From Swiss-Prot:
TPR repeats lie at residues 315-348, 383-416, 418-450, 471-504, 513-550, 552-582, 583-616, 656-689, 723-756. This is TPR repeat-containing protein TP_0920. Transmembrane segments: none annotated. Keywords: Repeat, TPR repeat. PANTHER family: CELL DIVISION CYCLE 16,23,27 (PTHR12558), CELL DIVISION CYCLE PROTEIN 27 HOMOLOG (PTHR12558:SF13). Signal peptide: none annotated. It comes from Treponema pallidum (strain Nichols). Residues 103-125 are annotated as: Disordered.
């Protein structure tokens, strides 16, 4: 008994004084102060994980973390899931591994032929984030990649909050660097592509982030110090890479990575890196050029001041300083810089042109006159200087000399509409009306081709003042109005031109488009819609006759014939002969084959169309319809499974519309239960889409979910009033036995759309269901005044129980 009690006391005091130490769980969302160097040979100390996704793969080995990109135009990253950092020093050694091509693929284009990188991030193609890698369309970053930048880029994402908010620091295989803040998938360039001078296949990329300051270094060389306060929260760190349009496969190796987040060490590193004595003059020059190209002239001017304190300016530096001063409207400073450049090289045309522009902007006409007189021979051979001669003569009220100078400038550069505009204005002042009109027309054609609609507006106003009834003036005005969305004014101009028998194919084509648009406004007036349809066809046919070698006109003519259920073989064949690689033409061929139940021909055309237009949902819709008619609709479902990353490119780009498309296909096939979840997915993407709400309601009616359908229709009605929604609400009310509500709904619809015969027919059917033949007869008497058709006569027989009257002659 004593021993047992002693044992109990011993266990009690042991548990009380010798408590077991429990290791608390690690919070990987914690903001930590540490120095950490990655050991990629160890799972615990590497932190990054191996993974695979859509078009990319990460693999960890003894030499580092390798990110493989398996297709062109891909931007992917792999997030380090351990801890968050705000102020830190990141150092990464990145190796660019050679690009490869799969068998049978064409070799890479030279840099001069590289396509531009798209300009915006594609948020729809990114799967979920941490710790997995993320793949997107390589849009990096807001502007075209310079030809010398290379074929790909790799780097770090830091302060990574989620897949749409982070900073991105990338260096290309050509040795160019850039920094962006990405917020809500929108890239905000902080430093555009800047040449670092690095040329090896291995880059040591360093970043020092302290508050709103970011110091960037490549291979221990200072590149820039950037200030930005867009993202001030701590975030993860990611290894990222982009593959552009040259190599099909690219791989990038993060062979070494270290991170320092201890405040004292970070501050020390920042001060050391930004010591003026450690920064070479060439770095200030390259940074100033990049900042000026980005439109940040004030920052560029600050860098030029630092550069001037370190070295003597040459021609390149003076020209850049002058350009930066002009951008800030510091024309005195610009004049000084360009004069210095001319001292360096008296024959430098760029300096001469820039100096002339700076003098003109200052209204320094005496200096400008001296400059042009000194370089008279050169001025007479250069379009810009001739234009300045015109400005000088105009300032001195020498209008004849000004007109001659502007005309000479336009002869030297016939693609510059402003020179023609200046000449026209002077000729008009001199009373040379016809010459002025011709000069204005030259300017108008150039502005229209360049889509310079503000300048074109000025020209059109002048032309309409000089000769408003001239055919060319009406044509230019109509095209301007059409391009700027003023379709009613454009219709007025084109209607007058076409009635006068215009010989301009573009006028007839645009007139046809406007008539097609007007056809849609006659939804409840069938005769007017048919008349517009016929006139549009005639307009497209006339455009084809005037421009027989334009595939677009033949395509539109064929399309109008197809929509009218007429033979379109001849114009379609002609369009294909002129433009065999036009995906829309192959899509129309597929639609025609589908109508004719020629499934093999439709499949062949759609295969070609989908290859040419991979992101167009309309083409995918026709493919789905083909499979539906073949009885293979279920085979199309994998194309819409975005969660498994096997979705079609068109689905990824437009999820809501794509899900809606598949739901409609199931509905058309009578598979209402299969359609319902796809309608739900579509509405989750676009909850305010009226068409989706209505189609979902129609599907619910088929499933006898009448209360659900009623709620959907009421929501659609709150967004947009349409006769079809009123009709469906009445149908649901009638099926629920609420005939008074159905009657009131249809009566209100008849009041709102008195020309819509469909609503009145539904009201007559409702009265027949309610056995109220008197009200049905009253509505039929109104209907027969608006429509004379077989269905109206059939209603007469139902109402009056007699043989319907014979059709009128």
């Amino acid at each position: 008994m004593g021993v047992g009690r002693a044992r109990l006391y011993f266990q009690y005091f042991k548990a009380k004084f010798l408590k077991r130490r429990v290791t608390p769980p690690v919070d990987y969302e914690e903001i930590v102060s540490e120095f950490w160097r990655a050991d990629f040979s160890s799972t615990e100390h590497a932190r990054w994980h191996a993974e695979a996704g859509d078009g990319y793969e990460t693999a960890r080995g003894a030499h580092g973390l390798t990110l493989h990109l398996r297709r062109k135009f891909l931007y992917a990253w792999s997030a380090n899931p351990v801890f968050r950092y705000k102020d830190c020093v990141l150092t990464a050694r990145i190796r660019f591994l050679p690009g490869t091509h799969p068998p049978g693929e064409a070799r890479a284009l030279p840099n001069s032929e590289q396509p531009e990188v798209p300009a915006s991030l594609d948020s729809t193609s990114r799967p979920a984030c941490l710790p997995e890698a993320v793949a997107v369309d390589p849009s990096a970053m807001g502007e075209a990649v310079p030809e010398r930048a290379g074929t790909c880029a790799a780097g770090l994402l830091f302060r990574y909050l989620n897949e749409s908010t982070f900073y991105a620091l990338l260096v290309s295989d050509g040795g160019w660097l850039r920094l962006d803040a990405v917020v809500n998938n929108t890239p905000l360039p902080l430093l555009g592509w800047t040449d670092t001078g690095a040329s090896d296949e291995v880059r040591v990329l360093s970043l020092i982030a302290v508050g709103t300051s970011f110091t960037l270094c490549v291979d221990d060389q200072w590149i820039a110090q950037i200030e930005d306060d867009t993202i001030q929260a701590a975030g993860k760190v990611c290894f990222a890479a982009q593959n552009w349009g040259v190599h099909a496969h690219r791989s990038f190796e993060l062979s070494a990575f270290s991170l320092e987040s201890q405040p004292f060490m970070v501050e020390t590193a920042c001060l050391r890196a930004n010591e003026p004595a450690r920064i070479p003059a060439s770095a200030h020059l390259r940074l100033a050029e990049s900042l000026y190209a980005m439109g940040r002239a004030a920052c560029a001017r600050a860098e030029m001041k630092k550069l001037k304190a370190k070295c003597t300016f040459g021609l390149r530096e003076y020209l850049l300083a002058g350009d930066i001063a002009c951008a800030q409207h510091l024309y005195d400073e610009a004049e000084e810089a360009f004069n210095a450049a001319l001292v360096q090289d008296p024959h430098c045309m760029r300096a001469l042109l820039a100096l002339g522009g700076a003098l003109y902007q200052q209204n320094a006409y005496e200096k400008l006159a001296h400059l042009l007189a000194t370089h008279r021979v050169v001025a007479e051979r250069d379009a810009f200087l001739s234009n300045l001669c015109g400005h000088l003569a105009l300032a001195q009220n020498r209008h004849e000399d000004a007109a001659a100078a502007y005309q000479r400038a336009f002869r030297l550069d016939p693609h510059q509409g402003l020179f023609a505009l200046h000449a026209a204005q002077e000729l008009s002042l001199l009373g040379e009306k016809e010459q002025a009109i011709q000069a204005y027309l030259h300017a108008a054609r150039l502005f229209l081709a360049q889509e310079s609609y503000a300048d074109l507006e000025r020209v059109v106003l002048a032309l309409r003042r000089l000769d408003p009834e001239r055919t060319e003036v009406r044509s230019i005005a109509g095209k301007l109005y059409y391009a700027t969305g003023r379709h009613r004014q454009a219709h007025t101009q084109f209607d007058a031109l076409c009635r006068a028998g215009s010989a301009d194919a573009t006028v007839w084509y645009l007139y046809g488009l406007l008539l097609r648009e007007a056809q849609g406004t006659h939804e409840h007036d069938a005769p007017a819609a048919a008349a517009c349809e016929q006139r549009a066809r005639d307009a497209f046919q006339r455009a084809c006759a005037l421009a027989p070698d334009c595939a677009l006109y033949h395509f539109k003519y064929a399309e109008s014939l197809f929509l009218s259920e007429k033979d379109c073989d001849e114009p379609l064949a002609r369009a294909l002969a002129l433009d065999p690689d036009n995906g829309w033409l192959h899509n129309l061929c597929a639609q025609k084959a589908l109508r004719e139940q020629n499934f093999d021909a439709a499949a062949q055309s759609l295969q070609r169309a989908r290859a040419l237009l991979p992101h167009e949902l309309v083409v995918l819709e026709n493919y789905i319809e083909l499979q539906r008619q073949r009885g293979a609709l279920a085979c199309c479902v994998p194309l819409f499974e975005v969660e498994t990353q096997r979705a079609d490119a068109a689905v990824i780009a437009q999820r809501g519309q794509a899900f809606h498309l598949l739901a409609n296909a199931f509905y058309a096939d009578g598979c209402y239960e299969h359609a319902a979840p796809w309608y739900d997915k579509a509405l989750r993407e676009e909850p305010q889409n009226v068409q989706m709400l209505v189609h979902k309601a129609e599907n619910s009616i088929k499933l006898h979910l009448l209360h659900e359908a009623d709620a959907l229709l009421v929501k659609a009605l709150d967004i947009q009033l349409t006769a079809h929604v009123y009709t469906l609400i009445a149908l649901v009310a009638a099926q629920l036995g609420d005939f008074p509500r159905a009657e009131l709904t249809l009566q209100e619809a008849c009041t709102l759309w008195p020309q819509c015969t469909e609503v009145r027919i539904e009201l007559i059917h409702l009265y027949l269901t309610m056995q109220d033949r008197q009200q049905a007869a009253t509505q039929w008497n109104i209907l027969v005044q608006k429509e004379d058709s077989d269905r109206v006569r059939a209603l007469h027989a139902l109402i009056f129980e007699e043989k319907p009257p014979a059709p009128q002659e």
